């Protein structure tokens, strides 16, 4: 897995990245009550605000971690936003995207670097 400074994780399968937020981010946000996901086949750029989440504490936007195309969204978290809190690294994923340039992954953190970043 790779991690961003915005507390997103990416799990790669070829050029397809499954993207979600880390346990740390989910804990900071508190219980989620609403998730709005991008549409499938949407072309996105690094830094685009593509997911809207609302929790009991705050509203927040999730940015695209790379240039690419959204290929799948997790409708389960739209119906049950609590999945993000209960299983942020598994069933609580947000979307899958085809990454245009995989070299962007070299700029992201591995697990040990991320754990140091949040401590």
Which residues does each PLM region occupy?
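Acidic, low-complexity mobile loops and tails
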Residues: 1-49, 82, 86-119
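A short, compositionally biased micro-patch
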Residues: 4, 12, 55-56, 65
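Residue-level recognition of beta-strand microenvironments
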Residues: 10-12, 56, 73-76, 102
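Structural motif
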Residues: 16, 67-69
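Short, solvent-exposed beta-edge and connector elements
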Residues: 28-34, 56, 64-67
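Short, Lys/Arg- and Gly-enriched loop/turn segments at beta-strand edges
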Residues: 54-63, 80-82
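Short, charge-rich, low-complexity interaction segments located
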Residues: 70-86
């Amino acid at each position: 897995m790779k991690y961003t400074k915005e507390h997103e994780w990416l799990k790669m399968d070829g050029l397809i990245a499954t993207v979600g937020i880390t346990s740390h981010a989910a804990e900071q946000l508190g219980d989620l009550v609403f998730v709005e996901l991008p549409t499938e086949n949407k072309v996105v750029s690094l830094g685009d605000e593509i997911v809207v989440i609302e929790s009991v504490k705050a509203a927040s936007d999730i940015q695209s971690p790379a240039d690419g195309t959204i290929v799948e969204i997790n409708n389960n978290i739209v119906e049950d936003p609590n999945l993000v809190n209960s299983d942020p690294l598994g069933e609580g994923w947000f979307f899958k995207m085809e990454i245009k340039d995989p070299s962007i992954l070299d700029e992201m953190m591995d697990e040990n670097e991320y754990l140091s970043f949040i401590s």
